[in-house]
Design a protein with these regions (language model features):
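Intrinsically disordered, low-complexity segments enriched in serine/proline and basic residues
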Residues: 1-5, 9-11, 25
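Short beta-strand motif preference
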Residues: 105, 117, 129-131, 239-241
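Hydrophobic/aromatic residues in well-formed alpha-helices
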Residues: 42-46, 160, 196, 266
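P-loop NTP-binding catalytic core
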Residues: 111-121, 125
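Short linear Ser/Thr-Pro motifs
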Residues: 95-97, 132-133, 219-220, 242
Length: 383
């Protein structure tokens, strides 16, 4: 990947000013601000203004949001293409793994901030898309590169949806379709809760993407009350909890947010989610040598999930420069841990992490230059 300049990520104050300037310039010139394709009321108002038959908009959405045709093809029969904004993001760079089916998309917002999405092509033929919900992340997990850069801002619903549109168009050219969408990219989804819910509504809406809610997965480091709210509002959407330890002191070392949401509160949240939904909650467990990977840890995890409807996903750790003190468990340790859980009757999967050669694996969703720039901005803004 080409080197990213320091101008590629803007501090939040500069980004806000840039957004306001863009809006002001359009207003001063008397220009009509293009309507986002995802803005249903706005598109309907535009249709009435242009006196278009409803089938024109319906066909446009089918072509772009269900078949993912190229922009020019999708807009070919639309009489005022300059009045519609198909994208809020632009593709800045694409990196394809040479060892597996992962593709990292580096995307730029209208004001120059960078986010990432990752396409995961599984050997079985299934394709998943990992999307970001924020620029950076406030959770500050010790094992995560994104958390080390701090938080710049939330992504809008249109910016989250555009990750799917861009990736879908890319995959359509390969004859592939996105089957699963996982909110496991940059950011804690429940720190952007309302935009997350708006996004889910658009993803599943019959007149937009019409993506099955059962093929959506929202992963959280443990915002307990929001997990329950999400399950109540979207009972067929899957939820995942990044647990990583059932020892409170260890979890607090790995995930500072654990001080706000202790383990007993998380367990109660999983129990409530189980009562509201049919699918098990995925328990994500990063395997760290000497931290959480002993057979005693496995037994304690078995006890913690006992009586809950869960599926444990054991994840190999991908090292990051900022946390040299963390080391991933070796394969025999991971396998012994998995066997211990299975012997206790716990549904368990040993996950293989894709995209490590292109820094696309979970925890690597920001390049070193991005992290350095973001952390520098954070330090300079402190009193």
């Amino acid at each position: 990947m080409g080197r990213i300049s320091r101008a590629d990520i803007l501090p939040i104050g500069l980004e806000t000013a840039a957004r306001n300037l863009l809006h002001s310039c359009g207003t001063l010139r008397g220009m009509s601000t293009p309507i986002s394709l995802f803005d249903r009321p706005g598109v309907e108002a535009l249709r009435k203004e242009l006196r278009l038959d409803p089938t024109v908009i319906r066909r446009l959405r089918v072509d772009l949001l269900k078949h993912f045709v190229p922009d020019a093809e999708g807009l070919a029969s639309f009489p005022a293409p300059d009045r519609l904004a198909l994208h809020t993001l632009s593709l800045y760079h694409r990196s394809d793994s040479e060892i597996d089916g992962a593709t990292k998309l580096l995307l730029k917002t209208a004001t120059g901030m960078l986010i990432e999405s990752v396409i995961l092509r599984v050997a079985s033929g299934r394709t998943a898309l990992c999307v970001s919900s924020q620029v950076g992340c406030a959770a500050a997990c010790d094992f995560c590169a994104t958390g080390k850069m701090g938080i710049a801002r939330n992504l809008s619903s249109a910016e989250i949806l555009d990750q799917l549109l861009i990736a879908g168009q890319l995959l359509a050219s390969e004859g592939r379709k996105i089957r699963n969408i996982v909110f496991m990219g940059m950011g804690e989804p429940f720190h952007n809760e309302e935009n997350l819910y708006t996004t889910i509504e658009s993803l599943t809406a019959p007149d937009l993407f019409h993506h099955p809610p059962t093929k959506l997965l929202v992963s959280s480091v443990g915002v307990a009350d929001a997990m329950v709210r999400c399950a109540r509002r979207f009972p067929t959407v899957n939820l995942a909890l990044s647990l990583h330890s059932v020892r409170q002191e260890v979890r607090e070392q790995l995930i500072p947010l654990a001080r706000t949401y202790p383990l007993d509160q998380l367990r109660e949240a999983v129990r409530e989610v189980n009562a509201l939904t049919r699918s098990p909650v995925m328990i994500e467990y990063l395997m760290l040598a000497g931290r959480n990977d002993s057979l005693d840890d496995a037994r304690e995890l078995s006890d913690w999930v006992s009586g809950l409807r869960v599926h444990v996903n054991l994840i190999p750790y991908t090292p990051i420069d900022e946390s040299p003190h963390l080391v991933g468990s070796d394969k025999p340790t991971r396998e012994a841990f998995s066997s211990q859980l299975k012997a206790a009757g716990i549904d368990t999967t040993l996950r293989y992490s894709l995209g490590q050669d292109i820094a696309a694996a979970c925890g690597q969703l920001v390049r070193h230059e991005n992290r350095k720039r973001a952390m520098g901005s954070s330090e300079s803004s402190r009193p």
